[in-house]
């Protein structure tokens, strides 16, 4: 699997993810890019789970963003509806984090679209480790990017499905 984290702090939104791709107990690739910009660069998205499934969902989300420009929540809810009700999509095994300047969302195959209470959340095999580390660092003078990187480092030290090859995307946040 992998670990993806989003941190909002100091007028910035940071999404970061590691690069490990595993097949069973074997590391197949260490530098995959699981965090990227979509929707004309205004949205960052990260995924955990089956890679082909995640790319299918990212493509669907991009189409929803074209249909509902500037409305990440609406696009995410529409994607979640399709994901839950479509016979083909229902079998996809992935989870996504998406964020724009104003909102962060976790989208699951169960039809959940969850907005974290403080804009910081994580998914994947090391998600709980990364989230705990990030929350512990929020009251420090570290930037959003420093917190995200350190949280992923901690997760990679604990989770065998997460590595230290980190990709970061940064957006300016509202208010």
Curated annotation (Swiss-Prot):
It is an enzyme of class 3 (hydrolase). This is ATP-dependent protease subunit HslV. Belongs to the peptidase T1B family. HslV subfamily. InterPro entries: ATP-dep_Prtase_HsIV_su, Ntn_hydrolases_N, Proteasome_sua/b, Proteasome_suB-type. It comes from the Bacteria. The lineage of its organism: Bacteria, Pseudomonadati, Pseudomonadota, Alphaproteobacteria, Hyphomicrobiales. It comes from Rhizobium johnstonii (strain DSM 114642 / LMG 32736 / 3841) (Rhizobium leguminosarum bv. viciae). It is found in: Cytoplasm. Na(+) binds at residues 156, 159, 162. Allosterically activated by HslU binding. Signal peptide: none annotated.
């Amino acid at each position: 699997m992998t670990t993806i984290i989003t941190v909002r702090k100091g007028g910035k939104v940071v999404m970061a993810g590691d690069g490990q791709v595993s097949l069973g107990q074997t590391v197949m690739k260490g530098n995959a890019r699981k965090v990227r910009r979509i929707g004309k660069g205004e949205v960052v998205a990260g995924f955990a789970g089956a890679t082909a499934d995640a790319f299918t969902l990212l493509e669907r989300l991009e189409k929803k963003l074209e249909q509902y420009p500037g409305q990440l929540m609406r696009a995410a809810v529409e994607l979640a509806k399709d994901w839950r009700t479509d016979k083909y999509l229902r079998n996809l095994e992935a989870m996504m984090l998406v964020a724009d300047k104003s909102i962060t969302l976790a989208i699951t195959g169960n039809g959940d679209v969850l907005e974290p209470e403080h804009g910081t959340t994580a998914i994947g095999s090391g998600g709980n480790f990364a989230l705990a580390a990030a929350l512990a660092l929020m009251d420090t003078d570290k930037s959003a990017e420093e917190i995200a990187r350190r949280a992923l480092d901690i997760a990679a030290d604990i989770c065998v499905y997460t590595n230290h090859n980190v990709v970061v995307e940064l957006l300016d946040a509202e208010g």
